[in-house]
Amino acid sequence: MNIFQILQKISLVPSYLWDKMWAPVWKRCMKHCGKGVYIRPMSSDFKGLWNLSVGDGTSIPKGSTIYCTDAPCTIGKKVLFGPKPTIISGDHRIDLLGKYIADVTVEEKFVDGVNVYDQPVVIEDDVWCGANVTILKGVTIGHGSVVAAGAVVTKSFPPYSIIGGIPAKLIKMRFTEEEIMEHERMLAVKCVK
């Protein structure tokens, strides 16, 4: 190991300690935080923690951006993220004449009594999102799915999908119907033990 590698490792210690110290505080601010959740709050960007739910055993890495607006973000159990995921449950209204986009109020996001610019994001259990994935408002990613690195997910996908691209498209299903049944049976047996 050369001196540069040693210095790099030493420089990570303060960040790690700050994250370790503040993680319990941030977890208490969440709508729900399961057991064994790993987050790096001081090296990530979280907004709207009161609208964020994270299931047991999920790991949210440093460099994450999660913006929960008036719509919730729900992340299931045992979800894996590669570096720098982005999850945003809201959007800006851009169609108001004579008004800067930055000046649009929350009340102005409502059309006929419905906020169409903020919609929930749901990432179900056992999903793996690769590096630099972006998941936008109104999306549900079905359990057991895989999201390829760099994907921008703008619509929902069923369980056991493998998706990728900009915008994300279905690449293929992870398992056949028979394999899904066997996989879920095996997982159910593990849960009983």
Kindly label every feature range from the protein language model.
Residues 134-171, 175-185:
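C-terminal/domain-terminus segments
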Residues 1-46:
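Extended, small-residue-rich solenoid/repeat segments and analogous flexible loops
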Residues 110, 176-178, 191-193:
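Short, structured secondary-structure boundary patches
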Residues 42-54, 59-137, 166, 174-175:
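Flexible, glycine/small-residue-enriched loop-and-beta-strand segment within the central core
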Residues 1-6, 17, 94-95, 100, ...:
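General structural signal for secondary-structure boundaries
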Residues 184-192:
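S-adenosyl-L-methionine-dependent methyltransferase catalytic module, highlighting the catalytic core
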Residues 35, 56, 77, 125, ...:
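Short acidic capping loops at alpha-helix termini that bridge into adjacent secondary structure
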